[in-house]
């Protein structure tokens, strides 16, 4: 089989490594891929949002199955285009990817179908939003409606911060068109849990839960990032809570999308908060999370390609999705200065052991040398029988990844370890 994976980050590297385990897979093409993915797949310089380029490549190379991993191409209709060309895909069509593509859509969906979430207001007019903020409870959460690379959510601790966030998005177009509509919502408290789930639009098979570490600095200080590390499973996500989420959130979401004529097939990511009043949805993503994928897939015992094809074919109910009863920890090594400005182009060295455990995100290959090319450069994952061992081993392996100006949080997994006690 010839496979195509759209995307070029650490998440895609993890997906490709898992897909490679299937003996029927001959070749995997990554569009565009990156310098590290080039060790595991054939990288082709076609951008993830170049839909014409992707479709033409897939047709010319007789691709048997495609996986569209990032949010942008999904929201733009990459799966629709590939399907029209007769190529089966993993991922939702554009009319279902809107669940991530528009926060206003997803909030209204939850309200209409009684899915627990924070109370909210939606604004398309700056003056109205500012008037609302005069009396809104503080802290409050301001979200850009559209895609903003995971950076379009501001937790405003003061009224001034809320006004600044809304003005930045609506008047100063900080996120372009994505911020022309904003959602202002109630600030919720409680542990956060990420749950990725396979779905064929009928059956939902959740993956092992995980805990992300969003802030740039230790002890959750500093700016929000795309994620500095993850552990799985999440100790706060007990069997009782999992059952409740399936009944109150996962199945109702799939049913709601079906009722709206927007059947969702692929990976649906539930960003949850376990509030004193029960689990609530903070956000939906229409794809595998990054860096959640880097801990979830290494624990998957079932064959990934088989499960993906079952979501496409509507046979997920008859397909086993099994995870190892172990723990995983992923530690991100980033360029110092991320998520703001940082220098790139530094050579990366990895020990053999580190390379085998590392998914590459922001790196390019030049004359056989791997050079840093992004903020988050690598993610190094260890799997062990206990969380403490997985954390220790992930850091030990990550020490084998080196480049100038490298930066890691030193406390990935500590919150989870405390929760277990």
Predicted region positions:
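Solvent-exposed alpha-helices and their adjacent loops that cap or buttress functional pockets
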Residues: 21, 36-38, 90, 112-114, ...
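ATP-binding N-terminal substructure of ATP-dependent carboxylate-amine bond-forming enzymes
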Residues: 1-94
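Peripheral (often C-terminal) accessory segments that flank ATP-dependent C-N-forming ligase machineries
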Residues: 310-421
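A conserved helix-loop-beta module that forms one wall/lid of the active-site cleft
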Residues: 90-152
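Active-site "cap" helix and flanking loop/linker of ATP-utilizing ligase/carboxylase catalytic domains
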Residues: 246-268, 285-353
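Short acidic-hydrophobic, aromatic-tinged amphipathic segments that line or gate anion-handling sites
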Residues: 43-49, 121-125, 156
């Amino acid at each position: 089989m010839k496979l195509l994976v759209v995307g070029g980050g650490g998440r895609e590297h993890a997906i490709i490594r898992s897909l490679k385990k299937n003996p029927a897979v001959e070749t995997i093409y990554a569009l565009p891929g990156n310098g590290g993915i080039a060790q595991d797949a054939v990288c082709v310089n076609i951008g993830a949002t170049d839909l014409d380029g992707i479709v033409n490549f897939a047709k010319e190379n007789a691709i048997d199955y495609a996986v569209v991993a990032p949010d942008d191409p999904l929201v733009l209709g990459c799966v629709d285009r590939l399907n029209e060309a007769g190529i089966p895909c993993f991922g939702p069509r554009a009319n279902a990817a809107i669940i991530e593509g528009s926060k206003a859509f997803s909030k209204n969906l939850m309200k209409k179908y009684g899915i627990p979430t924070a109370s909210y207001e939606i604004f398309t007019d700056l003056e109205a939003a500012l008037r609302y903020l005069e009396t809104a409870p503080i802290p409050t959460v301001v979200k850009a409606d559209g895609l903003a690379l995971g950076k379009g959510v501001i937790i405003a601790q003061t009224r001034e911060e809320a006004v600044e966030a809304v003005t930045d998005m609506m008047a100063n177009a900080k996120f372009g068109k994505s911020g022309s509509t904003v959602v202002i919502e109630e600030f919720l408290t409680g542990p956060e849990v990420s749950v990725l789930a396979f779905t064929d639009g009928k059956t939902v098979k959740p993956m092992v839960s995980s805990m992300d570490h969003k802030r740039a600095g230790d002890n959750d200080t500093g700016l929000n990032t795309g994620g500095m590390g993850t552990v799985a499973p999440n100790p706060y996500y007990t069997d009782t809570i999992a059952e409740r989420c399936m009944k109150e959130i996962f199945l109702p979401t799939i049913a709601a999308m079906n009722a709206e004529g927007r059947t969702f097939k692929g990976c649906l990511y539930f960003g949850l908060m376990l509030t004193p009043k029960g689990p609530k949805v903070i956000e939906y993503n229409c794809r595998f999370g990054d860096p959640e994928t880097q801990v979830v897939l290494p624990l998957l015992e079932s064959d990934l390609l088989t499960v993906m094809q079952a979501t496409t074919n509507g046979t997920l109910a008859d397909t086993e999705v099994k995870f190892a009863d172990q723990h995983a920890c992923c530690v991100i090594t980033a360029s110092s200065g991320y998520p703001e400005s940082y220098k790139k182009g530094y050579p990366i060295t990895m020990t053999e052991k580190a390379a085998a455990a590392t998914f590459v995100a922001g790196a390019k290959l030049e004359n056989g040398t791997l050079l840093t090319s992004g903020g988050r450069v690598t993610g190094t994952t260890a799997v062990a029988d206990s969380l403490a061992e997985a954390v220790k081993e992930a850091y030990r392996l990550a020490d084998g990844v080196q480049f100038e100006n490298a930066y890691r949080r030193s406390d990935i997994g500590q919150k989870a370890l405390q929760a277990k006690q």
